[in-house]
Amino acid sequence: MTTHGAERAALDGGRQPMPRRLVPVVALLFLAPWAAECSWGGFAGTDMLGVVVVLAPMYGGAAVLIREAARRTGGGWPMIVLLAAGFGVLQAGLVDQSLFNPDYLADTEFAELSAADRTRVPVLGISAQQAISFVGNHVALTICAPIAIVESYLAPTRRLRPWLRVPGLVVVAVLYLLGSLLVFADDSGRKGFLASPGQLVGAAAVVLALVVLAALPRWRRRPLPAPAGAPRPTRPGLLVLLVYLGVSMLSGWIGVAVSVVVVAALVWMLARWSGHADWGQRQVLASAAGALVGAAVLAYLVPPYSPASPTQALISDVIVSLLAIAMLTGAYARVRRHESVPAYPG
């Protein structure tokens, strides 16, 4: 999409009634924290609503701001993925500082299961395995999957349009800052830990580098699409699902090395496929579904943060599965309804 096209889309989006523009914003605000913390079984069913409400300003605010930045500038999915990675480092490195805190999971059910110390890098004070897990899940579950799902519910003419005007963006930015401050101030999460100045500067430098990379003009200069040849939606969906589950099961330095190679290959393959003229929203949704279904499957294999009986854990995991199925089924039905519209270029 050209810069002129993005500007015209912004003007068109601004003419829509406010309630119509706010529905997807609210949906993304609440879907992002659910996908980030609940979709993989992190919390019991009775706690999900509270978790979503408390974390919506931070996780949801970030998702909305990243989506608006990409759609307003025409940066598309490359920009979304890079900004999502920046958010992952910002969140884990500067806000809750889980990237550096060796005791971050000490009082949870993951304390006995974590193999993070086996891949700890003494100079940096991080676990390579946890860095991949924390940042990767923020990219896949907190940002990319929720954006793809919410946009799938919209008509094709609205998927690339901004949802908010400047005042709305300011409100969401303030919500994000307040939500982040709330998490940072919660000492029960950080357990009194504060990263060293060197760690904070290093994390901030990585975030800045990712933001600068995301802002490069090259993402707004799209080459002409290749001839038809994109795979059916099931193919990228299954590929993302297998990679998500496989990476989640790996541990140790060998697991870290394999994860980096496999994830890089996945990103390359999706980027290659998306360059074809017949790559559409169904493929985008299938890729998001692969991550969300992978998280729902993982929920049956890992415990929640807090102790729960086997029955409580199973009920919560079933709730997660049903919500994911309902959400994805509805999104797929909406895309099918509009599938006669020309292929999705984002």
Label each region the model flagged:
Residues 53-68:
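Central hydrophobic cores of alpha-helical transmembrane segments in multi-pass inner-membrane proteins
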Residues 83-102:
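Hydrophobic alpha-helical membrane-insertion segments
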